[in-house]
Amino acid sequence: MKNLLFIIAIFLLVLNAQAQNVGIGTTNPLARLHVPDSSILFSAAGDIPASPGNTPISGAGRRMMWYADKAAFRAGYVNGNQWDIYNIGNYSFASGVYTTASGYSSTAMGYGTTASGSTSTAMGYGTATSGSVSTAMGYSTTASGTISTAMGYSTTASGNYSTAMGSSTT
């Protein structure tokens, strides 16, 4: 009987512990992690490693994620492997829905955007950059040339140092 009571008590303790919020600097946390009136720092010493470890989580889901091994930040929702280790560029940033920033120091924001070129930026809906130092903004725009810019609706800047603006221009 004592063993049964002990097991029930331990079970209730674990159940209660899992349901509580954590507070740093507060005795009354309002969320799972609550740090009131303060800054938060996530850091790692030195430069990124030559062989980065796995991401904190992979696959589909909603998340906000700092991946220290690649100094990369992600926030939003993905439905597949967009934010898995091989689709995250060193020093990159991606936010929104179905975004991928796989290029070195690249940025992808919006819905279904992909920035695969080194230091490239893709913003909007269905935009893509594959050229180095390229920019795609708007709806379904593509900047594939080096240092190219595509802006507007369904524009493509495929030549190096090219610019395409407006609607359905190349």
Model-derived regions, located:
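C-terminal trimerization/auto-chaperone modules of long, extracellular attachment fibers and adhesins
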Residues: 4, 10, 18-170
